[in-house]
Amino acid sequence: MSAEKTNQSWGGRFSEPVDAFVARFTASVDFDKRLYRHDIMGSIAHASMLEQAGVLSAAERDAIIDGLKQIQSEIEAGQFDWRVDLEDVHMNIEARLTERIGITGKKLHTGRSRNDQVATDIRLWLRDEIDTILGEITRLQQGLLEQAERHAEVIMPGFTHLQTAQPVTFGHHLLAWFEMLARDHERLVDCRKRVNRMPLGSAALAGTTYPIQREITCRLLGFEAVGGNSLDGVSDRDFAIEFCAAASLAMMHLSRFSEELVLWTSAQFNFIELPDRFCTGSSIMPQKKNPDVPELVRGKSGRVFGHLTGLLTLMKGQPLAYNKDNQEDKEPLFDAVDTLRDSLRAFADMVPAIKPRVEAMREAARRGFSTATDLADYLVRKGLPFRDCHEIVGHAVKYGVESGKDLAEMSLDELRRFSDQISEDVFAVLTLEGSVNARDHVGGTAPAQVRAAVARGRALLAAR
């Protein structure tokens, strides 16, 4: 092993430097440097608290805070030299602070460990990312509401088993995705409450002997509460797992939505058109217009599901308190956040631009005997038991398949072959409009109910 000298803040106990490969293997700065802003935010709050607790002088506090702000400017200007030998974002910033302001920089870490420091950084970062994601969900929901209102009367087939089932309106179908996203929003809001608890002050695992005032840093950093147990504060990552669980559900919804969009843009369905800016072509087939955005979102969902499993597996065997294993929490969490945020952004941009092919949807709804249930309900209203009506209509559908006729295309005489209870008024029931208008209750597909649901949706978004 190489004995190339490394620069470590903890080297006093060691008689030889860390091997150069091991230093690179154990370093996390390549990926955790994205926490720099929140690391500096936490350090500024910590320095302010140390001054109020009498650990730092006001001059020392001011020097530290000014130095940290200058370092943030260096990072954002691309002028900061990230060093692998300093392991991580925390030690890189602390070393640079000491370079800038001298020995006072070494006092910043008083009463603090990297264990509670990184746990705080991740929570601050994730809290901000959740807020961004919540905004993208709302933006996507707004697009769905606009489309649902615009197409409240456009009729399409509803499916079960991907077989034609009953007519629905396009607006009603889109509102199903609105409802799923509303639950995703609720889950993330709830998750944020548990993210927003402060571990800073837990130190390595047992707290600190310094007279820290955790309520001060809690207030300065905008946390809702101080963590109640120092061992728990530095060791658990359940908040990251919970986020990945909520993110997995949201990505599952987007993946299902993507599957429908992919199907609907195909020549076999031809239900919708996506703008060219959300599609790509083929390097060999000149006619192709591929729905890459929904296909990629569908594919990316697996990444987030995998990160959830990875984090659960990471944590399941760890004794209290902190273990180096937890360095592996960041990359899956970062990627889960990036994937969900970017997928939502793509959908929020794309959904308002979707154009339904109204006639193709209507023709598809007309095929497949989609008003068969309406005929059965019609016979129930004539006094027949539903099971008998089900069988009667089943025979009528069989006849329609053999003769190539939809129920609405059959003559009255043909329909009466299956039940003498059928009369001229049946044709109002068998129209697509009659079918959707009949389902005029809360949650139903009738255009009036779609518009009412849009109004409720707008009120929900306005209350956020």
From Swiss-Prot:
Belongs to the lyase 1 family. Argininosuccinate lyase subfamily. GO terms for biological process: arginine biosynthetic process via ornithine; L-arginine biosynthetic process. Transmembrane segments: none annotated. NCBIfam families: argH (TIGR00838). The lineage of its organism: Bacteria, Pseudomonadati, Pseudomonadota, Gammaproteobacteria, Pseudomonadales. Pathway: Amino-acid biosynthesis; L-arginine biosynthesis; L-arginine from L-ornithine and carbamoyl phosphate: step 3/3. It is found in: Cytoplasm. It catalyses: 2-(N(omega)-L-arginino)succinate = fumarate + L-arginine. It comes from the Bacteria. GO terms for molecular function: argininosuccinate lyase activity. The keyword Lipid metabolism does not apply. Pfam families: ASL_C2, Lyase_1. This is Argininosuccinate lyase. InterPro entries: Arg_succ_lyase_C (IPR029419), Argininosuccinate_lyase (IPR009049), Fumarase/histidase_N (IPR024083), Fumarate_lyase_CS (IPR020557), Fumarate_lyase_fam (IPR000362), Fumarate_lyase_N (IPR022761), L-Aspartase-like (IPR008948). It comes from Azotobacter vinelandii (strain DJ / ATCC BAA-1303). PANTHER family: ARGININOSUCCINATE LYASE. Keywords: Amino-acid biosynthesis, Arginine biosynthesis, Cytoplasm, Lyase. Its EC number is 4.3.2.1. It is an enzyme of class 4 (lyase). SUPFAM superfamilies: L-aspartase-like. GO terms for cellular component: cytosol. HAMAP family: Arg_succ_lyase (MF_00006).
